[in-house]
Amino acid sequence: MNKVFKVGLIGCGHIAETYFRAHKYFNNFKIIKCADVKSEAAKKCAKTYRIQAVSVNELLKDKRVEIILNLTPPKVHYQIAKKSLLNGKHVYSEKPLAINLKNGKELLKISKKKKLYLGNAPDTFLGG
C-alpha cells in the first residue's frame, strides 16, 4: 500500500476550491486541516470539505501534518513557506515561490539544510 501524506492547507480563498476538486483524483495525499488569517474563510472551507479548521500556528505545530499546501497571496508565500520549513514541514506553494530572488534562495537553503521538499506550482495544480 502506498503512503498517504497528510496535508495542511493554508489560504482558503478561491484557488483552494480548485485544489480540493482535483485532490479527489489522487490517492497519495489527503488534506486533513485548513487555516486562513480570516477564520470565517477557514471555517467555511472546513465545513464544505469536511475537514478541521485551525489557526495557522496550530496547523504548523501539528505533528500529523507532513506537507503544507501554501495557497496564500503571493506577498506572504515566503513567510508561510519559511515558517512551514522551520516547523519541519514539506512545502508545496502556488506561484510565485517568493517575490524576490533573495527570499527564494533562502527558502531553498532552509529546505536543503532540513532535508525537506520545497515545490512550486508552475500553473494551478499542475494544470488541473
Residue ranges and their predicted role:
Residues 26, 62-63, 127:
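Acidic-histidine catalytic/liganding microenvironments
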Residues 1-49:
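N-terminal Rossmann-like dinucleotide-binding module
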Residues 26-28, 87, 112-116:
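Short helix-capping segments at alpha-helix termini
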Residues 51-110:
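Beta-loop-alpha module in the N-terminal Rossmann-like domain of NAD(P)-dependent dehydrogenases
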Residues 31, 53, 91, 117-118:
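Hydrophobic beta-strand scaffold residues
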